[in-house]
Amino acid sequence: MNIFTRYHLPRVVSGVILPLFLFHLLPYVTCQQESVPTNSIRQTNLSADSIIAIVVLAIFISLGMVSCCLHCIFYREEIGAAGQDVLHSRARRGLEKEVIESFPTFLYSEVKGLKIGKGGVECAICLSEFEDQETLRWMPPCSHTFHANCIDVWLSSWSTCPVCRANLSLKPGESYPYLNMDVETGGVQKLPNERSLTGNSVTTRSRSTGLLSSWRMAEIFVPRSHSTGHSLVQQLGENLDRFTLQLPEEVQRQLVSLNLIRRSHIVLPQAVSSRQGYRSGSVGSERGGFSQGRQTHRRALSMSFSFSFQTASVRSIHDMNDQAQAKDKYFGERSFERLMPEEKV
């Protein structure tokens, strides 16, 4: 039973069909009364009764039609208001700008040689491969990576990951655990592998690698159906793996810390750039000073990101060289002392 049948059928029966049925019976009533012996008084009374009945029926019919029209008008207004609420709710389904900017961005050339495996080479939105100088945005909850422009447009209308549908929205008062960082020291306090979102608990690799593992297990039981010898399950797994950028834990921490430092020091480069422009003699070229400061800040961040992962290896090599030199020096001095004759007193 639809909405019209539920709400309008009783009104139509009581306001339209019943008066029409009574109006249809009037000729039979008048015919039966005309068969009665007539006189002038009774004819006058019968004509008055019929007129009254017709007027009453007309009033009932008009009232029924007016009530149906009013109900339709009010019902249409309610539907319009509900539709506006649905449209507004759909428009508010996206993430806020601050939440979108909290996801780390970087150049593909900076992490191209640090990624684990062969994944993370294609954007799932525009289906184009990453270039070295393109800016990417990385989703820490699911390790999926997209072009910054593509994912920003998507997250402005939707609050889920385009690949694994992980819910990225937060409840009021919540915060992302991987954003717990001491901005003054520049170090991440904690980067857990799991974080709880609204409704579901999504791990860093639960959606992507979990589906891949299930598909690879199902590959054993699914027969080869393609002429090239590749199964459908294997193709699905490989296609999904192309969108997943797996990075070492230290690299993930560096990405998050650099992103937070960039967001927290967004005003500082302007002051530095204005001073640099004034000291360099470019008085009046305030725009050039600001752009120079932003370029200097970006260069410093990229240099810190590029060389931060090589510090440990360089230090270890220097330490090993120093220890080897000290050891050789020690043994060389000892062996040389043994060859020297003892002086007699």
Swiss-Prot record:
The keyword Electron transport does not apply. PROSITE patterns: ZF_RING_2. It catalyses: S-ubiquitinyl-[E2 ubiquitin-conjugating enzyme]-L-cysteine + [acceptor protein]-L-lysine = [E2 ubiquitin-conjugating enzyme]-L-cysteine + N(6)-ubiquitinyl-[acceptor protein]-L-lysine. It is an enzyme of class 2 (transferase). The modification Phosphoserine is found at S264. Pathway: Protein modification; protein ubiquitination. It comes from the Eukaryota. GO terms for biological process: protein ubiquitination. The keyword Transmembrane applies. The RING-type zinc finger domain mediates binding to an E2 ubiquitin-conjugating enzyme. Belongs to the RING-type zinc finger family. ATL subfamily. This is Putative RING-H2 finger protein ATL36. It comes from Arabidopsis thaliana (Mouse-ear cress).
